[in-house]
Amino acid sequence: MTPEHLPTEQYDAQLAEKVVRLQSMMAPFSDLVPEVFRSPASHYRMRAEFRLWHDGDDLYHIIFEQQTKSRIRVDSFPAASELINQLMTAMIEGVRHNRVLRHKLFQIDYLTTMSNQAVVSLLYHKKLDDEWRQEAETLRDALRAQNLNVHLIGRATKTKIELDQDYIDERLPVAGKEMIYRQVENSFTQPNAAMNIQMLEWALDATKASKGDLLELYCGNGNFSLALARNFDRVLATEIAKPSVAAAQYNIAANHIDNVQIIRMAAEEFTQAMNGVREFNRLQGIDLKSYQCETIFVDPPRSGLDSETEKMVQAYPRILYISCNPETLCKNLETLSQTHNVSRLALFDQFPYTHHMECGVLLTAR
């Protein structure tokens, strides 16, 4: 695979290999055959970032080859959304011969939605001034004249200039209902929107017979907690990043959801609060004991759950675990499988043509 060529004819084979690999990894804990969810074979990534290479009068996107670190020129990127590909061409054309916009520009980040909105961030090794803003506004207007619904942001050390806004609103059809998700520039969002829809619908199906309340750790912008709210009486969710918490609060209102409470704190801190080890001012007015959480949802970073959180989640009858790293999932399962059985297993092909796998498990207490 090269950045400008996807081996789409090998899609089925690479997915089959992942299924075999996941089954092998999960064998000590379950003999279930994974439910498999396919990605679009191309144009599946909704975000991408590229370094910029200045070569005389020429200017182009590059990425670095992982092993050799050599530069690879990228004029098109079929893994990314069609809108990103359109913007890649339009941005180079708009910046190449503009001294103010081009000077010391070293990176461009693209964030797009299925609803055809985009935020493009230009990163610089220089101070940004009013002249930069004026030229950037002219470029933005030219892009919009090409029917590109785009917002531009300039970034430099300790500087961020938003011409309009630093977010876009994604609209996803999830099990017969449209979900609105505000996505903020430079914050985590699910990279593969089509796969995200399938993950949300799988999680909804896995929890459809649930009772009581849901607790979610690492909720981000509320991606899962808001979609799952329809299956539970109440949802209590934690997140540490301020922009994600703000986006989650917006998403609660935009989706007219009244049974979700977001708390800004780390999963480790929440574990301490639940266990009565520490009290936190930010939990004032929230009666943790009033929640009857029979299900806990975790979507941890690649490092998986820490040992204290492992112990905490074992107290719940049902654990829904989405993992972006099956190796750390299996490490966690060495502990969790002492009290819970794997009752559902899913493979989500979030990153086609790569070694990476995303998977989901539903664990039920013995």
UniProtKB/Swiss-Prot annotation:
S-adenosyl-L-methionine binds at Q190, Y218, N223, E239, D299. GO terms for cellular component: cytosol. It is an enzyme of class 2 (transferase). PROSITE patterns: SAM_MT_RNA_M5U, TRMA_1, TRMA_2. Pfam families: tRNA_U5-meth_tr. SUPFAM superfamilies: S-adenosyl-L-methionine-dependent methyltransferases. It comes from the Bacteria. The keyword Transferase applies. It catalyses: uridine(54) in tRNA + S-adenosyl-L-methionine = 5-methyluridine(54) in tRNA + S-adenosyl-L-homocysteine + H(+); uridine(341) in tmRNA + S-adenosyl-L-methionine = 5-methyluridine(341) in tmRNA + S-adenosyl-L-homocysteine + H(+). One of its GO terms (biological process) is tRNA methylation. The active site is at C324 (nucleophile), E358 (proton acceptor). GO terms for molecular function: rRNA binding; tRNA (uracil(54)-C5)-methyltransferase activity, S-adenosyl methionine-dependent; tRNA binding. Dual-specificity methyltransferase that catalyzes the formation of 5-methyluridine at position 54 (m5U54) in all tRNAs, and that of position 341 (m5U341) in tmRNA (transfer-mRNA). NCBIfam families: trmA_only. This is tRNA/tmRNA (uracil-C(5))-methyltransferase. It comes from Citrobacter koseri (strain ATCC BAA-895 / CDC 4225-83 / SGSC4696). The gene is trmA.
